[in-house]
Amino acid sequence: GYNLRIIVRSLDKFPQELLENSKLKIIKASLLDLSDEQMLEAVKGCAAVASCLGHTMSFKGMFGKPRTLVLEAVKRLCLAITATRSADKTKFLLMNTVGNRNPGERVTTGERFILSLLRNLIPPHYDNEASAAFLRDNIGSENEFIEWVVVRPDGLINAEISNYEVVATPPRTIFNGLTTTRANVAHFMCECIEQSSLWFQWKGKMPVVFNKKIK
């Protein structure tokens, strides 16, 4: 198996078997509290970096500081990856949301109105858009050290791994969304890291992941 490093805010609900896994190094911290040197050490030697960071679903988490939690984390992680000056490009995966639309994706008038409201009134939505835009516009497709994929799940739920689909654009409007199991998101991200053909298919893109309906 792989050697992993993870940064977690809390170990309260962490499975004991993972705590005892010799291939797993756990860094207990809020990511933005790490110094530049600590951030560099966290990513040094990593072939891939995956971020599932998000705002907690409370009033303070959604409207308190830092309002651009994900954006600042993405910026600092990318700076740290660049500073390692690895001979091989590092894969960077960001879990985002299907509510963040790709430039040029078709949206209805109603969706455009709602997304505009969310962008201006709900800081986490703006944060999701800005973090993906940073990768798209600042890292781009020809970066010397980083390749990226932004993974867009629909309505997240907790359940076991199941069959899922991956498509380039959302198959439904935000008013008629689908569900995505968190475990399926994790599985897809791991598959992207492990399978060169899958990475080549989605690098520099924003694939949508959702549970496959049982017929």
Predicted feature residues:
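NAD(P)H-binding glycine-rich loop region in Rossmannoid oxidoreductase-like domains
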Residues: I6, D12-R76, A80-A83
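Oxidoreductase cofactor-interface core, primarily capturing Rossmann-like NAD(P)-dependent enzymes
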Residues: G1-N3, R9-L19, L34, T56-M57, ...
